[in-house]
Design a protein with these regions (language model features):
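A glycine-rich dinucleotide-binding beta-alpha-beta segment and adjacent secondary-structure elements
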Residues: 127-128, 134, 305-385
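Glycine-rich loop(s) and the adjacent beta-strand/alpha-helix scaffold that form part
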Residues: 156-202
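An anion/pyrophosphate-binding glycine-rich loop and adjacent beta-alpha core
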Residues: 34-36, 41-42, 50, 56-57, ...
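Feature captures the FAD/FMN-dependent oxidoreductase FAD-binding
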Residues: 76-156, 304
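Glycine-rich active-site loop/strand segments that organize a redox cofactor
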Residues: 47-95
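Glycine-rich FAD pyrophosphate-binding loop
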Residues: 21-45
Length: 407
């Protein structure tokens, strides 16, 4: 009977432990925190968006970095398989907008409790408050791990330590150190699925404002479009956040952000011509009202002053005094509300980490290192990341499962 040690009790680690156990191994799951699945508890705003209910090819379209590497793992353990696993083990699920899958209870704890119960049933020995300090190798083969309490021998080690995002959950980049010490390449670590800071103070009055059904685009200094999306976003004290902004960060983290502009189309369903006609009708109806007052039928109160300042039209003007030139300026800003990008928020605020152990060093069919026999990597520690919507947790489940199966 092989002995398998898994470092890290998150999504990847728990599925690796499950997979290794059902394949007849003696399995030890080592977690440096006081409980398993600490990051799972806070995903999906505490509801745990655990996968996305789409086919493998559509899933891969949402993977930003190294999607081809994941093809085999996702076919081994697909979103359907993950949903079946939880349903069959008593955790009822539901699918919401954007094919996002959540526990029916809306409690992330139900996901972790289900996994822990299954691991216990399969005989996995869970060792909490156990930090690994080194992976021991000899002649390019794993021999065991060194912990603060001593040496643990084993036949295989699976590194599921997560990335460098949300360090309070225990993701402090340990896996990158293990990888480098065993000769692996680690690509540059960057924040992904993170808020974006804006220059200046032209957004300060918008803090807390949520916008739905808007279109955003990011453009380089030469005007070339870098990213475009449609959906929901939020203004914050530092700039912008929300689903479409987080997704944009997955692309922007690979871009020089100097002179990058964010444009928000507040009325994406209307052309500028149709929007001008709408403005004309609104202003004719409210002839004696001030422009600021009349704009309330078009925009949230917090946005009106910002739009008028950027369009250069006096909000105190009566609607009957608004010229066609004024209307066109307002229509343009409504379609092109522009801000200057400063930088991404720091990695400790990121939902996931971009970069990690180079997939060139890993066998995609097994998740085993090509350099060290018996050493496997799974989950966020790898140089793979995806958009928001349950994709990253599914990647952790799938790569963990494959690693455990082959350990």
């Amino acid at each position: 009977m092989h002995t398998v040690i898994i470092i890290g009790g998150g999504a990847a680690g728990m599925f690796a432990a499950y997979s290794a156990a059902i394949n007849g191994n003696r399995v030890y799951l080592l977690e440096k925190n006081e409980k398993l699945g600490k990051k799972l508890y806070i995903t999906g705003k505490g509801r745990c968006n655990l996968t996305n209910n789409v086919g493998v090819q559509e899933f891969l379209n949402n993977v930003v970095c190294n999607p081809k590497f994941l093809y085999g793992a996702l076919n081994e353990l697909s979103p359907d398989d993950v949903m079946g696993f939880f349903e069959n083990n008593g955790c009822k699920l539901k699918t919401e907008r954007g094919n996002r899958v959540f526990p029916e209870s809306d409690k992330a704890s139900d996901v972790t409790k289900t996994l822990q119960r299954v691991l216990s049933e399969k005989g996995v020995k869970i060792m909490l408050n156990t930090a690994v300090t080194e992976i021991k190798t000899e002649s390019c083969r794993v021999k065991g791990v060194e912990t603060e309490s001593g040496f643990l021998p084993c036949d295989s080690v699976i590194v599921c330590t997560g990335g460098a995002s949300y360090p309070l959950t225990g993701s402090t980049g340990d896996g990158y150190i293990f990888a480098k010490k065993t000769g692996h390449t680690v690509t540059e670590i960057k924040p992904s699925l993170v808020g974006i800071e804006l220059n200046g103070d032209g957004f300060s009055d918008l803090q807390g404002l949520s916008l739905k059904n808007v279109s955003v685009s990011f453009s380089a200094a030469d005007g070339k479009e870098i990213y475009r999306d449609f959906g929901e976003m939020l203004f914050t004290h530092y700039g912008v956040s929300g689903p479409i902004i987080l997704s944009a960060s997955c692309t922007l983290n690979r871009t020089d952000l100097k002179n990058v502009k964010l444009k928000i189309d507040l009325k994406p369903a209307l052309t500028e011509k149709i929007l001008d006609e709408r403005l004309l009708r609104e202003f004719e109806r409210a002839k004696l009202k001030s422009l600021s007052n009349a704009m309330r039928s078009l925009l949230p109160q917090a946005l009106i002053e910002t739009v008028l300042i950027k369009s250069g039209v006096n909000g105190e003007k009566r609607c009957c005094d608004i010229t066609k030139s004024d209307r066109l300026k307002i229509a343009y800003v409504l379609k092109n509300l522009e801000f200057s990008v400063k930088k991404l928020r720091p990695i400790d605020e990121a939902v996931v980490t971009a970069g990690g152990v180079s997939v060139k060093d890993i066998n995609p069919k097994t998740m085993e290192s090509k350099l060290i026999k018996g050493l496997f990597f799974a989950g966020e520690v790898l140089d793979v990341d995806a958009l928001t919507g349950g994709f990253n947790i599914q990647i952790a489940f799938s790569t963990g499962y494959v690693a455990g199966k082959n350990a």
